[in-house]
Structures are given as C-alpha cells and as structure tokens.
C-alpha cells in the first residue's frame, strides 16, 4: 500500500467516520491509524483475515463514494492551497488585489 493511499484514507476516515458503523470504524482505525495487520485484527475479533480484508475494502469504497458526493476532502485540499497562496501574497504586500481575490475564492468554498 502506498503512502499516498494511506494518507488519503486517513483523511477520508477523519472526514466521514461518523457515517460508518462501529465495526467499520474499529477495523479502519486499527488498520490505518494503529497499523495493525489483517491477521492481528482478525485475531482481535476472532474472524478470518478474509473477513477483515473484505470489510476494509468495502469501507474504503464507501469512503470514496462519500467523498465523490460530498467533496469534503477535495474542498479541504483547495482551502489549504488557497491559504498557502494567501500567505505567500501577504509576504509580498504589493499584490493585495490578488490576495483579496483568493480570499473571495476561499469564502465560496464553504
């Protein structure tokens, strides 16, 4: 699993965990946040590794569907990028008009 995918899943889990069942939250938390292996999670819950794998894959797909519809992570990244640009512009105070335009763009995201 790539670091990029892990980071994305961690963000999606943060944004959408309230929409998951207790079991889904637990499996995802153990797998992504606590870095448990499938076998360790299976032992903890007394189920097969395949059951854990299937649950995690289904939950990942659900998180991606939530993001596709709600776009919370996308908007978060856009806000983060706009804020970065704003900080750069504030450092160069000669470009206040561009800073105001970025602020307006940021306000429209919410």
From Swiss-Prot:
Which InterPro entries does its entry note? RNA_pol_sigma_r3/r4-like, UPF0122, UPF0122_fam_protein, WH-like_DNA-bd_sf
Name the PANTHER family for this protein: UPF0122 PROTEIN CBO2450/CLC_2298, UPF0122 PROTEIN YLXM
Report the sequence similarity comment from the record. Belongs to the UPF0122 family.
According to its UniProt entry, what is the function of this protein? Might take part in the signal recognition particle (SRP) pathway. This is inferred from the conservation of its genetic proximity to ftsY/ffh. May be a regulatory protein.
Task: Name it.
Answer: UPF0122 protein BPUM_1495
């Amino acid at each position: 699993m790539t670091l990029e995918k892990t980071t994305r899943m961690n963000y999606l889990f943060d944004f959408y965990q309230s929409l998951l069942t207790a079991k889904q939250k637990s499996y995802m938390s153990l797998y992504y946040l606590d870095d448990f292996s499938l076998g360790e999670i299976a032992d903890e819950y007394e189920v097969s590794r395949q059951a854990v794998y299937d649950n995690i894959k289904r939950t990942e797909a659900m998180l991606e569907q939530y993001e596709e519809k709600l776009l919370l992570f996308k908007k978060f990244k856009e806000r983060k990028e706009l804020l970065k640009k704003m900080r750069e512009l504030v450092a160069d105070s000669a470009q206040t008009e561009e800073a105001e335009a970025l602020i307006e763009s940021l306000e429209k995201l919410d």
